[in-house]
Amino acid sequence: MKKINVVILALSILFFAASCSKDDPTPEVDQEEVGTAKLIFTEVEREAHGDHAHYNDIQNPEVVTVTFSGADMLPPVGEHLHLEVGKSYRLQLVATDFAGRETQQTFVARADIHQAFILGAPANSLSYEYGDIDANGQALNVGVTGYLTVNALANTFTMNYVLRHLNAGVKGRITAADWNNASYNQFTGENDLDLKVSVHLVAEGDHDH
């Protein structure tokens, strides 16, 4: 009887060890760790089509780029962007990991748990449309690519680009109209990126201050 009990105990230990090895997979390397980030504003032509617009590349576009780095993901000291009233810009996020490899497509690949919000501008001074699409041409509303239109003059303000890593199931409650929702924290999750830069909305050609 004693030998039988020993055998049963040994088998139980083996079964428990096998179960644990199946239940505890090796953690994946986090592909969303960001070392640097850039926001690139490229002037485009906005072509209105009723309730939506097409955005077309133009020759010799104005391009404005700001890079964020360091532990706090800050722009260069004194960085100050000018965007011109009446113009539309393709706003692109380019993110790299700590090895310098681009990682922004990770956010698009996980579109069900990511969405960007663009905050800080005076009311009605900007409008924005998400531009991310999947392989089938379906809109994803992530914000790695989008289109920003400057509607009105505005004194300098702090533009805040927040890329939210949402809890499961939350994205279904968010619409494209929430792009500048100051209460974005109601959409539970954590921020993968929280980028801030000084922006001034100016008349065409007025870049003197």
Where are these regions (language model features)?
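Bacterial Sec-dependent N-terminal signal peptides
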Residues: K3-I4, I13-T42, H209
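Short, solvent-exposed beta-strand/turn "edge" segments of beta-rich domains on protein surfaces
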Residues: E28-V29, G78-V85, V150-N151
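Short beta-strand elements
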Residues: I174-H209
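N-terminal edge beta-strand
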Residues: Y55-E84
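Short amphipathic, basic-aromatic surface patches that mediate peripheral association
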Residues: S21-E28, E45, D97-T106
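Extended, polar beta-sheet/loop recognition surfaces of beta-rich domains
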Residues: E28, R101-L153
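Internal, hydrophobic beta-strand segments that form the core of beta-sheet-rich folds
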Residues: Y89-A95, L153-N181
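A composition-driven surface/loop motif
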Residues: V34, L39-F41, E45, H52-N56, ...
